[in-house]
């Protein structure tokens, strides 16, 4: 295990990180966190440290993770939808960086039914899905990139589902400002 992640599990246990509700319990947040950590390690190993791609991949992975809690903590559905959309866009950008890496290096892209792809996709359904599940894959550039392609695709699908749900909720219930305005108008009628 890489030194930078040696204490990863003890950190999570110490802070009761995995037991916290809210956005930290969202499967796509957990996956975005793994994607970010894995990407930081990936670019250290396989992308030239002077390359602009290194910075862009790290920033896209970070944005994919960080916009989830920022959006989740918004009072308005519009804010949640917007920031979750930003997270989704960042992960799509990162997905394309990994696809470019595979193509530019002449590596084989795993097909959806490839045994390795199925194994990686199964990690997501594990209650203990965390960075160490993916640790064996970081030692090979082509496997590491393929693993992230699988995980990002899964995460994007989950975010898309959440966005559809939030959009439907917005249509049914209205937005934060709209509801505040209704409450204000009701109060005026009472007084």
PLM regions with names:
Residues 1-191:
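Amphipathic alpha-helical assembly/interaction segments
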């Amino acid at each position: 295990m890489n030194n930078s992640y040696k204490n990863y599990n003890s950190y999570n246990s110490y802070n009761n990180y995995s037991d916290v509700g809210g956005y930290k319990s969202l499967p796509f947040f957990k996956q975005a966190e793994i994607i970010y950590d894995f990407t930081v390690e990936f670019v250290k190993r396989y992308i030239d440290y002077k390359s602009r791609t290194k910075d862009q991949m790290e920033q896209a992975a970070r944005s994919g993770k960080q916009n989830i809690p920022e959006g989740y903590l918004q009072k308005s559905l519009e804010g949640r939808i917007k920031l979750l959309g930003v997270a989704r866009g960042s992960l799509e950008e990162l997905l394309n960086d990994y696809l470019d890496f595979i193509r530019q290096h002449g590596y084989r892209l795993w097909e959806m039914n490839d045994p390795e792809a199925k194994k990686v996709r199964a990690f997501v359904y594990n209650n203990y899905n965390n960075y160490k599940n993916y640790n064996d894959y970081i030692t090979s550039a082509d496997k590491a990139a393929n693993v992230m392609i699988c995980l990002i695709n899964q995460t994007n699908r989950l975010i898309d589902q959440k966005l559809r749900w939030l959009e439907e909720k917005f249509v049914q219930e209205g937005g934060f400002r709209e509801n505040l305005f209704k409450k204000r108008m009701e109060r005026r009628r009472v007084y």
